[in-house]
Amino acid sequence: YLPQEFGFYPNLSVKKYLAYIASLKGLKNKVAERRIDILLETTGMKEHSLKKMKELSGGMKRRVGIAQALLNDPKILILDEPTAGLDPIERIKCRNLLGELAKGKIVLLSTHIVSDIEAIAKKVFVMKEGKIIKEGTVEELCSNIPCKVWLYYLNTDEAEGFISRFKS
């Protein structure tokens, strides 16, 4: 499980934090060490493994969160707003990583960002009050709910003006 905001001990290194979480999940030391090494490599955090958690950027913390969610190799991965608060570049990196790591798993994803869903899921189920109300690909779902989803492509020159309209 990857909550939108997860707690961590700020003075623990990335590696020690993951070892601590692995012990809470009941992983044996040797198994935990192997999984941590694999996940540090996979998430691109190997070179930062000795940094303290408080020294990490938002994107790095999110990657550590993904690693902790995958420590015990779950069959079902629950992600709550996995790219919330990330800048556009980190958002793309994060969802590409999740797309790779989610292969062969059931992923329950809570997000309001359609592009995150597109990058991670082949088939989407929309739930309301615990019941499935729609299912299909992102494209199918978006075409079936006109006036609810908008997609607009900006060139670099337009982006600044567009973004400034939404700043307070």
Regions found by a protein language model. Give the residues of each.
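Hydrophobic anchor residue at the start of the ABC signature
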Residues: 66
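Conserved ABC ATPase signature
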Residues: 52-56
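ABC ATPase "signature
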Residues: 135-136
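Conserved ABC ATPase "signature" region
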Residues: 19, 23, 30-48
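Conserved catalytic motifs of ABC-family nucleotide-binding domains
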Residues: 73
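Catalytic Walker B motif of ABC-type/P-loop ATPase nucleotide-binding domains
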Residues: 77-80
